[in-house]
Regions:
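N-terminal Rossmann NAD(P)H-binding glycine-rich loop of SDR-like oxidoreductase domains
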Residues: 18-42
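Conserved beta-strand positions in the Rossmann-like core of class I SAM-dependent methyltransferases
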Residues: 21, 45, 65, 126, ...
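Non-catalytic, hydrophobic alpha-helical segments
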Residues: 29, 87, 168, 198-202, ...
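NAD(P)H-binding glycine-rich loop region in Rossmannoid oxidoreductase-like domains
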Residues: 46-112, 116-119, 207-210
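Glycine-/Pro-rich loop/turn segments that contact NAD(P) or position catalytic residues
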Residues: 93-185
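Substrate-positioning beta->alpha
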Residues: 150, 189-204, 214
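Glycine/proline-rich active-site loop of Rossmann-fold NAD(P)-dependent oxidoreductases
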Residues: 177-180, 205-214
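Short-chain dehydrogenase/reductase
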Residues: 215-223
C-alpha cells in the first residue's frame, strides 16, 4: 500500500478552539480558510449576502450567517460578531464591479466591520488586502487603481483603531495547488500566490500573536509559512 500523502500545510491549534467570523464567507479564500480552521478544531462563521450560499459554507465547515455589509448598521454587524475571538475581512466587490462598489465594499465594508468589532469587544482583526495597495494613482479612474485606493484607505483606517490587527497583502491570486511555501516582506516583488496558500497564511496568522500590529505582502516563495511568520516578528509596525 502506498504511504498516505501528507498535506502541504497543516494548522496545529496552539491555543483553545477559537470562534472566527469571516466576512465574505463565500469567497474562494474564505471557503478554503474555513475548511482549514474547522479541521483544526476552530469554529468558523461566514457572513454572506445570499442565503443560497449557505450549503457551500456548511460543506466547508463554517456556520453561515446572512448579513449584508452594505445594508447593515454597525450595531447589527456588532451583534453578529459578539462572542467571537477573531474577525477576518475577506469580502470583495469582485473584478467586474464598478468604481463606486469598490469603495463601498472594499473600503467602507472593511472599515464598518472593523468598527463593529470594536463595538463588539472583539480585538483580533485580520484583513485580506492587496499587494501594492499604497501605490495607486490618485488621479486615475481605472478600476484597478480605485481598488488599490479603496484597500489602502481601508487598511489605514483599520490601523488607526484600537484592535489587534494584522493586514495581509497577497500578490496576484491563482487557483494553483498549495505549496506551503511563501515569501513574506513589507514590500515584495509583484509575483503571484495560490488562493490555497493565502488561506493557509491566514489560518497561521490567526494562531501567531507575533503578527499583531503587522502589515506585510505575501507571494509564493521558498519559506514554509510558519517560519516566514516567525521571522516577521522583528519587523516594524506599519505607519
Amino acid at each position: 500500500m502506498a504511504p498516505r500523502e501528507e498535506p502541504v500545510f497543516s494548522l496545529v491549534a496552539y491555543r483553545e478552539a477559537m470562534h472566527i467570523v469571516i466576512a465574505g464567507g463565500h469567497g474562494k479564500i474564505a471557503l478554503l480558510l474555513s475548511r482549514l480552521l474547522a479541521d483544526a478544531g476552530h469554529r468558523p462563521t461566514g457572513l454572506i449576502r445570499d442565503p443560497d450560499q449557505a450549503a457551500d459554507l456548511r460543506s466547508a465547515g463554517a456556520e453561515p450567517v446572512v448579513l449584508d455589509l452594505e445594508k447593515s448598521t454597525r450595531e447589527e454587524i456588532a451583534s453578529a460578531l459578539t462572542g467571537a475571538d477573531a474577525v477576518v475581512f475577506a469580502a470583495g466587490s469582485g473584478p467586474d464591479s464598478g468604481p463606486e462598489r469598490k469603495l463601498t465594499v472594499d473600503r467602507d465594508g472593511a472599515v464598518l466591520l472593523a468598527e463593529a468589532a470594536v463595538s463588539a469587544g472583539v480585538r483580533r482583526f485580520v484583513v485580506v488586502s492587496s499587494i501594492g495597495a499604497d501605490e495607486y494613482d490618485p488621479s486615475s479612474s481605472d478600476g484597478m487603481q480605485i481598488y488599490l485606493k479603496a484597500k489602502s484607505e481601508a487598511d489605514a483606517a483599520v490601523r488607526a483603531l484600537d484592535l489587534d490587527w494584522t493586514i495581509v497583502r497577497p500578490g496576484g491570486l491563482t487557483n494553483d495547488e498549495p505549496t506551503g511555501l511563501v515569501t513574506v516582506a513589507e514590500r515584495s516583488d509583484r509575483s503571484s500566490i495560490s488562493r490555497a496558500d493565502v488561506a493557509a497564511v491566514f489560518a497561521a496568522v490567526l494562531e501567531a500573536d507575533q503578527t499583531i500590529g503587522k502589515q506585510f505582502e505575501v507571494v509564493g516563495g521558498s519559506t514554509p509559512i510558519g517560519e516566514a511568520l516567525t521571522n516577521l516578528g522583528g519587523a516594524s509596525q506599519a505607519e
